[in-house]
């Protein structure tokens, strides 16, 4: 049986001298305790040395992918086919490929693994012609080359640093929040007014660290942290504070906590700058599109930049909202429109009704930027700047469209003005000068009811005036009737009635708004005939 053993220096093919020893797997390691014992079990048959590290890297990358290198193929055809013996290999996948392409029987079992372990332990004694120093140097060079190839290593492109930095930044924010809240509550017993005057947490801790006890504010100078007005307000509040007195030991512990808050805040600022620089080095286009914090959170959520590049735009859009998505799918409701991408500046500055559209468009352009950063050779951010400008223009159009609808200018812009030739003669419309009331179009019921009420009130007032005038005329006519002969009373009374009717009809005709003449009804005609007959 032959054994294929791969080293950093070259391929080695050993021949097993005593196969009976291989049956005892548990005690096989004893046969490789010394080089002399190892030479009794296996013997080197052929050694194919690599010329340089590049050739060794190509050979090992092919082995990891389960492929046969040209150099290995030549060795196997030359040595193993002539021997007509089975070949022991360390990788079962490689054995299957050798059997398929070269028609050689390959063996892979726990015995073979133990045999490989023994050969590796006595490699210097089993492979003559290779110095230990050369073997170690070749081993180290191949290890570095192989790691660089597998990890796609670059000094500037290590997204693991981004994942750890953004996670640490979130943890620092939580810790700072807890520490500052505890500090304000703790010192609030001694000087509660200070928390209302100074809203900035870092300034609050710096003032507290410099002054300490409330009594020292009168003589302390806080111009480094506060303006003159705020400083005067703090000193005035310290004199009339309603806080309790505390011991020096309590003040010391509070000051230690303030020191921790200030140090963590400074480290957080430094870490944020580091994250900005690292994001611009690894994913400049993504940073331009969504910002360094959102981009770093997307990379951390996916695990790496390469994993994020494999996601579709629809997945990137809702990345971070998985719970809401599955809850919506379970309850058959509307799925969420955005996840972590909601915190991007483009989505934040858009109106609520346009956030869904902008997040969808931003996700599509962000995926292009991610793939460009992950697989592209160019490290510039030109593509991200161009796509961001397009999205900003699109957002501006959407926002302007909504403003035009509200103001009513959209219709005016949509309709083109009617073309009028210079030779056309414009005529004057005299109907605009008419002062006569005209019948308007159909109006609303509420307006008609209001106008009816107004006309009724006017009609009542007119009737009251008419009655007063009629009564005066009646009194005058009665005085005249006393002087007239008794034969004519009936005729005069009828004339009085006609006058009353005539006076009542005149104001009513003035109140009618329409210009059309009223047609007399048949009942009125009959009454007029009767009056004429009576006069005759």
From Swiss-Prot:
Positions bearing Phosphothreonine: 34
Residues where Phosphoserine is found: 109, 304, 351, 509, 521
GO aspect biological process, one term: ribosomal small subunit biogenesis
Region (Disordered) residue spans: 414-440, 470-536
Source domain of life: Eukaryota
Biased composition (Basic and acidic residues): 414-427
Gene Ontology terms for molecular function: ATPase binding; snoRNA binding; TFIID-class transcription factor complex binding
Keyword annotations: Isopeptide bond, Nucleus, Phosphoprotein, Ribonucleoprotein, Ribosome biogenesis, Ubl conjugation
Biased composition (Basic residues): 492-502, 524-536
Domain Nop: 282-400
Listed transmembrane segments: none
InterPro entries: Nop56/Nop58, NOP58/56_N, Nop_C, Nop_dom, Nop_dom_sf, NOSIC
Pfam families assigned to the protein according to its UniProt record, in alphabetical order: Nop (PF01798), NOP5NT (PF08156)
GO cellular component, one term: fibrillar center
Cross-link entry Glycyl lysine isopeptide (Lys-Gly) (interchain with G-Cter in SUMO), positions: 467, 504
Cross-link (Glycyl lysine isopeptide (Lys-Gly) (interchain with G-Cter in SUMO1)), chain numbering: 467
Statement: the UniProt record of this protein carries the keyword Mitochondrion: no
Cross-link (Glycyl lysine isopeptide (Lys-Gly) (interchain with G-Cter in SUMO2)): 157, 353, 411, 415, 422, 426, 441, 444, 465, 467, 492, 504
Biased segments, Acidic residues type: 470-488
PTM section of the record: Sumoylation is essential for high-affinity binding to snoRNAs.
Entry's localization field: Nucleus, Nucleolus; Nucleus, Nucleoplasm
Quaternary structure, from the entry: Core component of box C/D small nucleolar ribonucleoprotein (snoRNP) particles; the core proteins SNU13, NOP56, NOP58 and FBL or FBLL1 assemble stepwise onto the snoRNA. Interacts with NOLC1/Nopp140. Interacts with NOPCHAP1, NUFIP1, RUVBL1 and RUVBL2; NOPCHAP1 bridges the association of NOP58 with RUVBL1:RUVBL2 and NUFIP1. Interacts with PIH1D1. Part of the small subunit (SSU) processome, composed of more than 70 proteins and the RNA chaperone small nucleolar RNA (snoRNA) U3.
Protein family according to the UniProt entry: Belongs to the NOP5/NOP56 family.
Function: Required for the biogenesis of box C/D snoRNAs such as U3, U8 and U14 snoRNAs. Part of the small subunit (SSU) processome, first precursor of the small eukaryotic ribosomal subunit. During the assembly of the SSU processome in the nucleolus, many ribosome biogenesis factors, an RNA chaperone and ribosomal proteins associate with the nascent pre-rRNA and work in concert to generate RNA folding, modifications, rearrangements and cleavage as well as targeted degradation of pre-ribosomal RNA by the RNA exosome.
Protein name: Nucleolar protein 58
Source species of the chain: Mus musculus (Mouse)
């Amino acid at each position: 049986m032959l054994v294929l053993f791969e080293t950093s220096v070259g391929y080695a093919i050993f021949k097993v001298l005593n196969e009976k020893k291989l049956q005892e797997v548990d005690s096989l390691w004893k046969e490789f305790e010394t080089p002399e014992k190892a030479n009794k079990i296996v013997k080197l048959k052929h050694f194919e040395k690599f010329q340089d590290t590049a050739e060794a890297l190509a050979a090992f990358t092919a082995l990891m992918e389960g492929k046969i290198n040209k150099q290995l193929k030549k060795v196997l055809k030359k040595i193993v086919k002539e021997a007509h013996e089975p070949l022991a290999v360390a990788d079962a996948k490689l054995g299957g490929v050798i059997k398929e392409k070269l028609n050689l029987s390959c063996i892979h079992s726990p015995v073979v693994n133990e045999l490989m372990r023994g050969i590796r332990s006595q490699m210097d004694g089993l492979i003559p012609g290779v110095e230990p120093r050369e073997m170690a140097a070749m081993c180290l060079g191949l290890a570095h080359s192989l790691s660089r190839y597998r990890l796609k290593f670059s000094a500037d492109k290590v997204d693991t640093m981004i994942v750890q930095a953004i996670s640490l930044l979130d943890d620092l924010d939580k810790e700072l929040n807890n520490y500052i809240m505890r500090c304000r509550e703790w010192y609030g017993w001694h000087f509660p007014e200070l928390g209302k005057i100074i809203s900035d947490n870092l300034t609050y801790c710096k003032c507290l660290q410099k002054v300490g006890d409330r009594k020292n504010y009168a003589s302390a100078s806080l111009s480094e942290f506060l303006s003159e007005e705020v400083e005067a307000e703090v000193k005035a509040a310290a004199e009339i504070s309603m806080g309790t007195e505390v011991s020096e030991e309590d003040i010391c512990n509070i000051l230690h906590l303030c020191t921790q808050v200030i140090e963590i805040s400074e480290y957080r600022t430094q870490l944020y700058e580091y994250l900005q620089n690292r994001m611009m080095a690894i994913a400049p286009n993504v940073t331009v599109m969504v910002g360094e914090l959102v981009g770093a959170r997307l990379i951390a959520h996916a695990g790496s930049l390469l994993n994020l590049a494999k996601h579709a735009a629809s997945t990137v859009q809702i990345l971070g909202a998985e719970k809401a998505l599955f809850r919506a799918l379970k309850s058959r409701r509307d799925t969420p429109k955005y996840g972590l991408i909601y915190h991007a500046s483009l989505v934040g500055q858009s109106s609520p009704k346009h956030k869904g559209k902008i997040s969808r468009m931003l996700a599509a352009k962000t995926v292009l930027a991610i793939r460009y950063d992950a697989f592209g050779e160019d490290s510039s951010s030109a593509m991200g700047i161009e796509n961001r400008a397009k999205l900003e223009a699109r957002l501006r159009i959407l926002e302007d469209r909504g403003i035009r609808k509200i103001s009513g200018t959209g219709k005016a812009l949509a309709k083109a003005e009617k073309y009028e030739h210079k030779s056309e003669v414009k005529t004057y419309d005299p109907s605009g000068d008419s002062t006569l009331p005209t019948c308007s179009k159909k109006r609303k019921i509420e307006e008609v009811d209001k106008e009816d009420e107004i006309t009724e009130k006017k009609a009542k007032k007119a009737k009251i005036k008419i009655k007063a005038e009629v009564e005066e005329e009646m009194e005058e006519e009665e005085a005249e009737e006393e002087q007239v002969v008794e034969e004519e009373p009936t005729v005069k009374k009828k004339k009085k009635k006609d006058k009353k009717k005539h006076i009542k009809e005149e104001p009513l005709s003035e109140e009618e708004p329409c210009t059309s003449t009223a047609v007399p009804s048949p009942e009125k005609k009959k009454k007029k005939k009767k009056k004429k007959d009576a006069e005759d």
